[in-house]
Amino acid sequence: MLILLGLLCLYTGLYVARTYWRLRHFPGPLVARFTDLGRLWWVKTSRSHHHHMGLHSRYGQYVRLGPNMISISDPDAIPLVYPIRPGVPKSDFYRSMMPYTRKGRSLPLVFNTRDEDLHKRLKTPIAHLYSLSNILTFEAFVDQVLEILFRQFEERFVPDQAPFNLGNWLQYFAFDVMGTMSFSRRYGFLEKGRDDTGLLSAIWAFMKAAAPVTQMPWVDLVWNKNPFIALFRATPAQPILNVVLSRINDRRNELYSTTSTPEKVNERDFLSRFMHIQSNSDTIPPWAVTAWSFSNVIAGSDTTAVAMKTLWYNLLLHPATMHRLRKELVQAQQQSKLSHPFPAWNEISGLPYLNACVNEALRIHPPFCLPFERIVPAEGMTIGDHFFPGGTVIGMNPWVINRHRPTFGEDADAWRPERWLEDPARTRQMENTLLSFGAGRRVCLGKNIALLELKKLTSALVLHYELEIVNPEKFQSQNFFFFKQEGLYAAVKRRSAGSPELYPDDAVPH
């Protein structure tokens, strides 16, 4: 036993000495030279994005966050760290983000699988489903959920104009849209005004368990993905998997009880298309439908909700922004360029100030805020004036990159949508630097869904309602890779001019 302990200590000592020596020229806090405990703790505090920003302000564009981890804030490095072609693989960070089942198995997703061949087998068959042209076939689903949201506003909040938790309702909207797109079934959050499925709390519990150990992946194996421990407690991802598996089983039962083919049963939603794709391929893993659906539930909904809350918090906090946005939308409406009651994507996607507000929301508060980690290939690589030995973990934090002052301006910490309209060349540079949805070959598949929801919801709300923020100082965020934003309260009333009433007083639909 003593011999084993001695060998372990020797191995640990040699590892620390080796990593310390080969990366010794990179600046950073003292603790980062010897252990990853510092960066685990920063995530545990739910404020790692502020810690990382402070470290880059102090040490520069290349900061050592751990014995073998360098954080980079130079936008010129984006195409090198996140290339279009394979060669710079994901780190063990992403293994920690894999859902773990009671059967002792991790569920690889398109987002978190490190195996390039498996990634190709998972992504290639479904990538076209997330193209803008295909996402627009779901636009009617967004309109259906918008109608339910506005109906709830009319019944619950417009009559007495009492403050309500706008942030919760934006999140309910995002989840019910994705439920409709994925399964042709809403979760029912909007009708009930709450989540009685436990899904939202389960997602947050999963992120709180997974995010800290992404910084020390061996802890994930010992605690979150330990088969022995799983015998005595539910894994954090299990409640989410239960929702996904329930929807899949319901669809299969529906198929068995009818003469319809998989293509004909709810042929417009994601699940039917997932099942059809899998049934026509011998190379797709048998659990792929579960993995694809899980991604839609957790990433397709929660990250969109973060962008919505950020956008609406800033619209309500900055009246000049709201005035200019409403002026743009009302002008388009008066020129008969917008459908009623809900503007269509092709009518609003080119509106300059709406696009500027959406871009600014995604910039100032990206949905994901830990470095997207990659492993330097064995031969090493040079970035800027620095050589990185093979095996070094490198990454870029969207929160830090999106505040790069030479790119976004000296006021990069401030909300200012106008920055996106001032100079076409600079706008292109900012768009190429924006890291909110990732970059390269592993860019987020759900980007088009998020943009569709953001622009349709925002344009419809601005045209039909006036909202006033209540106690804005209570709005706060916690970061566990995904964000949890709380405290966005507002009062709402119908607009008195500028657009026809959505629902006449005597004709509120039920």
UniProtKB/Swiss-Prot annotation:
It comes from Aspergillus flavus (strain ATCC 200026 / FGSC A1120 / IAM 13836 / NRRL 3357 / JCM 12722 / SRRC 167). GO terms for molecular function: heme binding; iron ion binding; monooxygenase activity; oxidoreductase activity, acting on paired donors, with incorporation or reduction of molecular oxygen. Pfam families: p450 (PF00067). Residues 1-17 form the signal peptide. The keyword Heme applies. It is an enzyme of class 1 (oxidoreductase). Pathway: Secondary metabolite biosynthesis. Its EC number is 1.-.-.-. Keywords: Heme, Iron, Metal-binding, Monooxygenase, Oxidoreductase, Signal. This is Cytochrome P450 monooxygenase AFLA_114810. The lineage of its organism: Eukaryota, Fungi, Dikarya, Ascomycota, Pezizomycotina. Its cofactor is heme. Heme binds at C444. Cytochrome P450 monooxygenase; part of the gene cluster 41 that mediates the biosynthesis of an extracellular and diffusible metabolite that is able to stimulate colony sclerotial production. InterPro entries: Cyt_P450, Cyt_P450_CS, Cyt_P450_E_grp-IV, Cyt_P450_sf, Cytochrome_P450_monoxygenase. Belongs to the cytochrome P450 family. Transmembrane segments: none annotated.
